Amino acid sequence: MEGALKEGRFGFEETAYLLLLGRLPNAAELESFQKQLAYYRTLPNNFVRDIILKAPSHDIMNSLARSVLNLASYDDQCDDISLPNVMRQCVQLISLFPMLSVYGYQAYTYKSGSSLYIHAPRPELSTAENILSLLRPDSSYSFWEAHVLDICLTLHAEHGGGNN
């Protein structure tokens, strides 16, 4: 994380790579991993409408769980526990969790009377930047907001799960 901070770049993707593979990526590996994450930031057709918007939940964890369970029905290899397939599923979930979280939040706030806006993720953005872009009505965010969120994502990834 210190290297990313010093160099003014985002560190979450590098940390995710480290946690999946047990070592830091070199520049080419990181770029390839970032491209994989961008590639998998796509939900099945009508998923947002049929799964997320039709039954909004005040509990984002409930919304995430329901979405992940439904995504399994779109995965022809969901029961394949080979290492390459499980790795693909991990990368795909890392890519999709931000979208599922933001879209779940947007669905709930819409149900509560706010305007609804659903933006598509942008492949050139980091995970932190995409979260902020998806979350805001005008997709705007500042450099510092994105970096603070990236640090938060990195710390949560490095320090375990649970409700922390």
Cite the ranges covered by each PLM segment:
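Hydrophobic alpha-helical bundle cores within soluble ligand-binding/oligomerization subdomains
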Residues: 1-164
